[in-house]
Regions:
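Short Gly/Thr/Asp-enriched flexible loops that form oxyanion-binding sites at enzyme active sites
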Residues: 166-191, 329-337
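Internal gly/pro-rich beta-alpha loop/helix module
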Residues: 197-269
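Conserved RNA-binding domains used in RNP assembly and mRNA/RNA metabolism
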Residues: 1-81
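A glycine- and small-aliphatic-rich helix-loop capping segment at beta-alpha/alpha-beta transitions
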Residues: 102-111, 178-192, 207-213, 246-249, ...
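Accessory alpha-helical/coil subdomains and C-terminal extensions
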Residues: 89-90, 100, 111-112, 117-122, ...
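ATP/NTP phosphate-donor binding region
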Residues: 4-5, 51-53, 60-154
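Interaction/scaffold regions that mediate signaling and macromolecular assembly across diverse proteins
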Residues: 130, 357-396
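CN hydrolase (nitrilase-like) catalytic-core segments centered on the catalytic cysteine
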Residues: 320, 324-359
């Protein structure tokens, strides 16, 4: 019905049209109908940036202007000698995406150059070199990609001495930030991850402020891997979160990230305000890249049985347990966990959003310690997994000793009681 209505009126996708109904008149650009559109619905991109579906029943259509067929090309911007140089690496994610109107879904498609050129405010912040690295949804990121990002970052630091902004999907950004933190323990210039909860083509997108904030942070003396994302739901400032102490805590809000047990490393408004203790940049970037993939993570829960534990751990070279509360697992699992701990490193952290493990409080916790399970205090589960993967590759004989030690700021509360 809608397709015939459009065809009969001679309209084509991206034409500017007016649709009038008995109730209201709408003007905007005609968008492709996606697979889930109703048969009587046409989709318009309004001037305010929002999309709207309009029923064609008893409606009239007028073509205001035909679609332009000119290809949009980005011109090379002149270098501003008064500004610093940074490199933006695009790896995919919502920040490098747009709404695919054939499906109604968000698809990674924007190039690194398009992303940078879409944020005009960047021209006043820094001279930008944009480089594509991957075009991946966050959930498709794997340890091999962490290694690729680290190698590229070191290459840029060695050749250009640029600060680096990495555009990344938000769902697994905390894993990637932790991974680079261990691979690049010393950096000569900042490495800042950023992303977006809403794609750049939406008027409510957080991509622009996050990218500008990350660019400003990339020109400081911050010698740690960090994440730059909205601190609140408004557009007032961007928070900088330590790469080993951050997790995504909300699935869709713009202020999605938090650092349990500690605040942000800094805030970005007009300027960057770094807070508290942080590592300054080093003379050169040091790298130990690579991970052991066969490390497992087990979340303790009421239904977890011995068979589940043995099935998960049978082909692994190390295991991280996300325990309940202070670091608890079921009593019936203690013997099986003890057997596993004789063959491979087993570490435990807490599922809780705040607080720390303390295996000295309850009997089960003390038994875990006696059986060789390593307590990791308030290390985040995501970080603990990445740390064991990295240690197993580079410090295989010291994993048990080092999992509970604070190497690069991954543990903020390392008290040992009892």
């Amino acid at each position: 019905m809608a397709e015939k209505f459009i065809s009969d009126n001679g309209a084509k996708v991206h034409d500017r049209i007016r649709i009038s109904t008995d109730a209201k008149t709408y003007e905007g650009f005609l968008l492709p109908r996606h697979n889930f559109s109703g048969e009587d619905i046409v989709v318009l991109k309004l001037d305010n940036g929002y999309n709207i579906g309009v029923s064609v029943e008893d409606a009239e259509l007028a073509i205001l202007s035909k679609a332009k067929k000119d290809k949009v090309e980005f011109t090379k911007k002149k270098k501003n000698k008064e500004l610093k140089d940074i490199t933006v690496l695009a790896t995919g994610g919502t920040i490098a995406s747009f709404v695919d109107y054939k499906t109604g879904a968000v698809s990674p498609a924007i190039t690194a150059e398009q992303l940078v050129n879409s944020v005009s405010a960047l021209d006043k912040v820094a001279n930008i070199d944009a480089e594509p690295l991957f075009s991946l949804a966050s959930e498709d990121m794997a340890p091999k990609h962490w290694e690729g990002i680290a190698k590229k970052a070191k290459e840029i630091h060695d050749k250009k001495q640029h600060g680096i902004v990495i555009g990344h999907g938000t769902d697994t950004m905390a894993y990637s930030a932790a991974a680079l933190s261990f691979q690049l323990p010393e950096i000569s210039n900042p490495v800042i991850f950023t992303g977006a909860q809403r794609s750049p083509d939406r008027p409510s997108s957080d991509a622009h402020l996050n990218l500008v904030g990350a660019a400003k942070a990339a020109m400081t003396d911050l010698g740690e891997i960090a994440i730059a994302m909205h601190q609140t739901t408004d557009d007032e400032n961007v928070a900088l979160w330590r790469g080993t102490r951050v997790r995504k805590a909300h699935s869709s809000r713009r202020d999605a990230f938090m650092s349990p047990n500690e605040g942000p490393l800094g805030l970005v408004k007009e300027n960057v305000e770094l807070k508290g203790k942080y590592r300054p940049t080093a003379k050169e970037t040091k790298m130990e890249s690579g991970f052991e993939d066969s490390i497992g993570m087990v979340w303790s829960h009421p239904g977890l049985g011995i068979g589940d534990w043995e099935s998960i751990t049978s082909r692994k070279k190390g295991v991280v347990i996300a325990g309940t509360g202070l670091g608890h697992v079921k009593s019936e699992l203690l013997e099986s966990i003890g057997k596993t701990a004789k063959d491979m490193p087993v570490a435990i952290t807490t599922q809780c959003l705040s607080g720390s493990t303390n295996l000295n409080v309850y009997r089960n916790g003390r038994e875990l310690l006696q059986k060789g399970v390593v307590e990791t205090y308030d290390m985040l589960p995501e970080t603990a997994l990445v740390k064991m993967m990295w240690l197993s590759k580079h410090r295989a004989d010291e994993v048990r000793e080092l999992m509970g030690e604070n190497l690069i700021g991954e543990i903020s509360n390392s008290r040992k009681l009892g």
